[in-house]
Amino acid sequence: ANIGGLGAGSWGTSLSALLHDNENEEAIWSIDPAEIEMLSKEREHKTKLPGVHISEEIQITGEIQEAILGKDFLVLAVPSPFTRATAKKMSPYVAEGQIIVDVAKGIEETTLMTLSGQIKEEIPQADVAVLSGPSHAEEVARLLPTACVIGAHTEETARFLQKLFMSAVFRVYISADMLGIELGGALKNVIALAAGIADGMGYGDNAKAALITRGIVEIARLGMKMGGRLETFSGLTGIGDLIVTCASMHSRNRRAGILIGQGKTMEEAMEEVHMVVEGVYSAKAALALGKKYHQSLPII
């Protein structure tokens, strides 16, 4: 297939490499001229994925239409706070029924919308799907075994995408519960921030296990009230993603939490992590959702 990637950070780059290894054609767009130059010249994302080679066959571009026009499907991999703005830019070039797979995780603070909801609002002609699960980019790029879930409105779209992403080391399940998948992915970042704070304060493993377990209960309670399914929250995109995010040093949310637990301010922690800490944005949205749906969320 011929694929367009939008966003050339660690996750966008890892997925491009995976899709290229699966014998697809690929063009990646970035908004950042310095990033485009580095990827084109060095064929490596020196800051975010050092040591991972990006094939010469993958086209790197600063022109958004080059990554959209005539592509079989698009992978939207920009950090969640930039989802809507990027979707606006994409809209004029997206064809009727063109598939967009969103791979970021978050909830919009102002509207409380999921990312797929924002994309659909800006690009009504698109067929929007999501990819989520316990999947640190650093490990996917190094071909370590990973399992994820594709959520789509139709089984046909889900199966089409499953076939293209699936590899010997990247296993893909499918689901129709897009809402549950997206809520699990966004809300677990908030719990990971809390787990990091507990680590930073030296609270130990018992406290962390309690946080993770009670955290998934809060996520599931709110998610089911909003229309998600229980099995989604107890699966890869719920408990699976929560475990990896709370336990791994790859997790920027956990790293930021540790720094806050050690006494740094939110701003200092985000500065030190050098990446977008999505849990910070999602925490405010999660609180507002709790109020809206009358759910008690003590950890969040």
Predicted feature descriptions by range:
Residues A1-V52, Q59-G62, K89:
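NAD(P)+-binding Rossmann beta1-loop-alpha1 motif at the extreme N-terminus of oxidoreductases
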Residues F82, Y93, Q118-A126, P145-L193, ...:
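Internal alpha-helical scaffold of NAD(P)-dependent oxidoreductase catalytic cores
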Residues I3, E25-E26, A126-V128, V172:
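Hydrophobic anchor at the start of a short beta-strand
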Residues K188, A195-D199, M224-S234, L242-I300:
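NAD(P)-dependent Rossmann-like dehydrogenase/reductase catalytic/cofactor-binding core
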Residues I54, I60-L69, F73-P145, L161:
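Rossmann-like NAD(P)(H) cofactor-binding subdomain of soluble oxidoreductases
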Residues G9, T13, P33, T61, ...:
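Electropositive phosphate-/nucleotide-binding environments in soluble metabolic enzymes
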